[in-house]
Regions:
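Intrinsically disordered, low-complexity charged segments of secreted bacterial virulence
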Residues: 1-21, 27, 31-34
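Serine-dependent carboxylesterase/thioesterase catalytic core
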Residues: 20-23, 35-40, 45-47, 54-71, ...
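Short, conserved catalytic or adaptor-binding loops enriched in Gly and charged residues
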Residues: 2-4, 73-76
Length: 192
C-alpha cells in the first residue's frame, strides 16, 4: 500500500521469515546519491505500524537535505537518499498485546540483547550500501532513535568496515559506548 502511494520509494529489504516483517526502503537512489542516511526506529516500531510515518519522514528529510545543499555554493549537484531500516524485531510494550507480551517487551528493552543481535545485520546493511556503489563511497550517516540509537551505536562498534561517516542519536537511552571517543574513532576509521 505504501509503495503504491509512493512509487518513487525503493524497497531494499523485505524479510517475512520472523515473527514480524522486517523491511528497509529508500527515498532516492542510495547507489548513486552523494549523501545517504539510514534511520533506525526504536521501541514499538514494526513494519505494519511504522512504515507510513517512516516513509513520510524519509521523503521530508531528503527534501530538506536537498534544499540545504542547493543553497550551499558548489554543492547544488550533490544528491541525497534517505533510508528507513526496520530490519529488526524492536521490543514491543503495548497494552493491546496483553500483559505477558508487555512484560517480555519490558525485559527486552531493559537489556541490549535485541539491539546487539540487530547490530550485526545493521552493520552489514551499512557495508552493503557502500559495496553496491560503482561510483565510490557515499557520505553515509547513521541515525538512531530511541532503542534504535542503541542498535545503531552497537552496529558502529561491530569490527570490520561499515563505511559510516557520521552518526546522529536522538531520544536515546544510550549507545553502549564506554566514551564518545569510542564511536568517533570507529566512525572516523571507517570513513577513511
Amino acid at each position: 500500500r505504501v509503495l503504491a502511494a509512493h512509487p518513487d520509494i525503493r524497497l531494499m529489504l523485505l524479510d517475512t521469515s520472523g515473527k514480524r516483517l522486517r523491511a528497509a526502503f529508500a527515498a532516492g537512489n542510495p547507489d548513486t546519491a552523494t549523501h545517504v542516511s539510514v534511520s533506525v526506529p526504536g521501541m514499538n516500531s514494526t513494519v505494519a505500524d511504522s512504515v507510513d510515518g517512516m516513509v513520510t519522514e524519509a521523503i521530508g528529510l531528503r527534501q530538506l537535505a536537498s534544499r540545504q545543499l542547493a543553497w550551499l555554493p558548489g554543492r547544488a549537484r550533490e544528491t541525497v537518499a534517505t533510508i528507513g531500516w526496520i530490519g529488526y524485531q524492536a521490543p514491543q510494550i503495548r497494552a493491546r498485546d496483553g500483559l505477558p507480551a508487555m512484560v517480555q517487551g519490558a525485559v527486552e528493552v531493559s537489556h541490549d540483547d535485541v539491539a546487539a543481535a540487530a547490530a550485526q545485520d545493521l552493520s552489514r546493511f551499512y557495508a552493503g550500501i557502500q559495496a553496491a556503489r560503482d561510483i565510490g563511497p557515499a557520505h553515509l550517516t547513521a541515525i538512531g532513535h530511541s532503542y534504535g540509537s542503541l542498535t545503531t551505536g552497537l552496529a558502529l562498534q561491530v569490527p570490520g568496515g561499515h563505511g559510516v561517516s557520521d552518526a546522529v542519536f536522538y531520544g536515546s537511552p544510550g549507545v553502549a559506548a564506554a566514551a564518545p571517543g569510542v564511536l568517533r574513532r570507529r566512525v572516523e576509521q571507517d570513513a577513511d
